[in-house]
Amino acid sequence: DGVEADDAKAVELYRRAAEQDYAPSIASLGLCCELGQGLPEDKPKAAALYRKAAEMGYTYAQCNLGFCYLRGIGVDRDPAQAVIWLQKAAEKGQSRAMSLLSRCCFDGSGMQKDEKRGLELLRRAAEQGYAPAQCNLGLCYENGFHGLAQDLSKAAELYRRSAEQGDAAAQSNLGSLYYTGSGVERDDALAFQWFSRSAEQDFPAGVYH
């Protein structure tokens, strides 16, 4: 299989660079271990590789290690450790880390609850074009979550930006706004279009519609 051969070749290149303590390749090896691409799936090894690269200051690995601690992937679940590593990456402007850390702020997971900071982080990640953050911020505006004034047109605009990048949840949410005419002019054809794109990704709400 050509894909498997390419994966194996990539792993070999990552290994050679990792032996020279090149942090991006160490993190890439970690991802291969986490996903089982070109290497047997080994989540504890993935977390260990992320840690090695994270301790070298590599932002992508810091975010991935934080996510491992958040979800218990290859390590015991530890929200406080998750916050430590996500914070390091977020301070360097890593959009996924800011988005994940915003959820910790909202939930008080591994840290003191801080909705104001959570919104600030979510906004920054959304402004950088990170689709899940745009979708989540849209959800906040649609429902008036976390002290935000409800703004359906703002929600629709954020969902659209996220949906156009392929975010299935945003596609479904945007479809709902078009279906009900909330924040946008009602348009059944556009509603169907966005529901269909969401359903193609097997997103439950999109499938339901």
Predicted segments — roles?
Residues 1-5, 19, 37-41, 55, ...:
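Short coil/turn and helix-start
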Residues 2-8, 12-24, 31, 63, ...:
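Intrinsically disordered, low-complexity repeat tracts
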Residues 3, 26-35, 64-71, 75, ...:
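Hydrophobic face of amphipathic alpha-helices that form TPR/SEL1-like repeat modules
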